[in-house]
Amino acid sequence: MTRHQPIVLVSPAMGIGSRYYQSLAGAFKARGWAARALTRRGFELGAPRASRGQDWSYDDEIEDMAVAVAAARSEVPGRPVIILGHSLGAQIAAGHQLNRVPADGVVTVGGALPYHRDYPWGGLPILLMGSVIVPVLTGVFGYLPAPAFGGPGARTLMREWGRMAVTGKMPFPAAARVRSPSLLISLDGDRLAPEIAVEAFGKRLFAPESVTHWLYRHADVPDGASNHHIYWARSPAPVVDRIVGWWTAQAAVTPAGGAAAGEPGPAS
């Protein structure tokens, strides 16, 4: 694929700032890869929080990701860029790959669409959140205040999230499918992104030939580690090992030079 080891750009989950992923970035660096966490609007130290006067959308977050991917490419030409999207970050990663110059590869962890029909028992809590709680609170306050799920959340982004929960309509164009190599990781017992919802996410947005699935089972969790939807990133060695192995296998079957910027990556 290339003589350069990749750089991993971590796109945080909803309500989590980049500082949470220091252990994850460190685990990649210990394996000889570069890695850094991208900022999450509204959740960085010293940055503006969502409010009636501070608003943004999925497309704004996607554009932030596009700027970060371009910057990573310019730093070391020819180095593969992999986006690792965690939860909400996975949705943004898919939107980026479909609507901007794509990264060379995508990894999602606990990534699913919040469409209630993709969840067990009809996803009633998600349906309630999307149809009632988000519209009412954003209408009253001009944003989604804490302690509501994802709060403080930007009005436009959370309303887009809510519409997706109710109707399944994506907050970005999705006529095509992601064709860059993609590793979709499910977390055993994850109630926020159960395996069935992760699989539906893959079917809706990713070309089948591009996707590799992995379920991080309870039995595979080392002592002192976790495969919880959030806490896996504090003890990320099993996830990082899986990603490195997956990408190494991709490199073994991809012609030298890899995919050019803006072109779909190789099938997996």
Where are these regions (language model features)?
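Active-site glycine-rich loops that stabilize anionic/oxyanionic intermediates
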Residues: A13-I16
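Conserved alpha/beta-hydrolase
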Residues: S18-Y20, A25-A50
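Alpha/beta-hydrolase active-site loop
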Residues: Q54-R73
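Gly/Ala-rich beta-loop-alpha elbow adjacent to hydrolase catalytic centers
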Residues: L84-G89, A93
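Active-site nucleophile loop of the alpha/beta-hydrolase fold
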Residues: V107-H116
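Short beta-strand/loop motif that positions the catalytic acidic residue
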Residues: V178, L184-S186, D190
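Short alpha-helix in the alpha/beta-hydrolase fold that links the catalytic acid
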Residues: P194-R204
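Catalytic active-site module of serine/aspartate enzymes centered on a nucleophile-bearing elbow/loop
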Residues: R217-S268
